[in-house]
UniProtKB/Swiss-Prot annotation:
Organism placement in taxonomy: Eukaryota, Fungi, Dikarya, Ascomycota, Saccharomycotina
Family of the protein in this entry: Belongs to the DCP1 family.
Name of the protein: mRNA-decapping enzyme subunit 1
Compartment(s) where it occurs, according to its Swiss-Prot or TrEMBL record: Cytoplasm, P-body
Superkingdom per UniProt: Eukaryota
Keywords: Cytoplasm, mRNA processing, Nonsense-mediated mRNA decay, RNA-binding
GO cellular component, one term: cytoplasmic side of membrane
Predominant localisation class: cytoplasm
GO terms of molecular function: enzyme activator activity; mRNA binding
Organism: Eremothecium gossypii (strain ATCC 10895 / CBS 109.51 / FGSC 9923 / NRRL Y-1056)
Keyword Kinase on entry: no
PANTHER family assigned to the protein according to its UniProt record, in alphabetical order: DECAPPING PROTEIN 1, ISOFORM A (PTHR16290:SF0), TRANSCRIPTION FACTOR SMIF DECAPPING ENZYME DCP1 (PTHR16290)
Example GO BP: deadenylation-dependent decapping of nuclear-transcribed mRNA
Self-association state and partner proteins as the record states: Component of the decapping complex.
InterPro entries: Dcp1, PH-like_dom_sf
Length: 193
């Protein structure tokens, strides 16, 4: 039997998902389906030269979502002022043909700049390297990797940069790891039921 409390919790969760979907849509109009979200995440970057994690200025809702990727779509060219700050702290802005079926975003509560990682299944990256070598020379991409260590979900992005995402809830941490691992190891999907 469903109680009023269960109905309220379900309604609140649906509201949160809808709100997150709409907010993400302002930053990435190609959002197609919200796959997972958690209310609190903090981003760290691994500095190999210093052999330590540096905490970045990104904290907030973390979401992983499916993107609407068309065969010949090009990534939009970012505004110069927006990309300059992001490149200094979070790596290069991707350009060229849009092969990024999924994305991870942290909707930042600290400042207006959000953190995002483009996610392409490793099979897509490998096919690009094989069938589009000229594109790979212009913008080389490497297969991504993900692991859980201590309290961080560690992600090696397409540019070999390593980020650690601290997730408040251990269950959410494991769910994010499992989802990212699935997205990287399987062929891209057009939708999730």
């Amino acid at each position: 039997m469903t109680t009023a409390r269960d109905n309220s919790a379900t309604t609140l969760e649906l509201y949160r998902k809808t709100l997150n979907f709409n907010v993400i849509g302002r930053y990435d109009p190609k959002i197609k389906q919200l796959l997972f979200h958690t209310p609190h995440a903090t981003v760290y970057k691994w500095e190999a030269g210093e052999n330590k994690w540096n905490k970045l200025e990104y904290q907030g809702v973390l979401a992983i979502y499916l993107r609407d990727v068309r065969e010949q779509a090009e990534l939009p060219v970012p505004h110069q002022e927006a990309s300059a700050g992001a490149e200094g702290r979070c790596g290069e802005v991707l350009s060229g043909r849009d092969i990024y079926n999924y994305a991870l975003i942290v909707l930042n509560r600290i400042n207006p700049e959000n953190f995002s990682i483009a996610i392409a299944p490793n099979s897509v990256v490998n096919k690009r390297r094989l069938f589009s070598p000229e594109e790979n020379v212009q913008q080389p991409l490497e297969p991504m990797d993900v692991e859980v260590k201590d309290e961080l979900v560690i992600i090696k992005n397409l540019r070999k940069e390593v980020y650690g995402i601290w997730i408040h809830t251990p269950t959410d941490r494991q769910n994010i790891y499992d989802l990212l691992k699935y997205l990287l190891e399987n062929e891209p999907k057009d939708s999730f039921a």
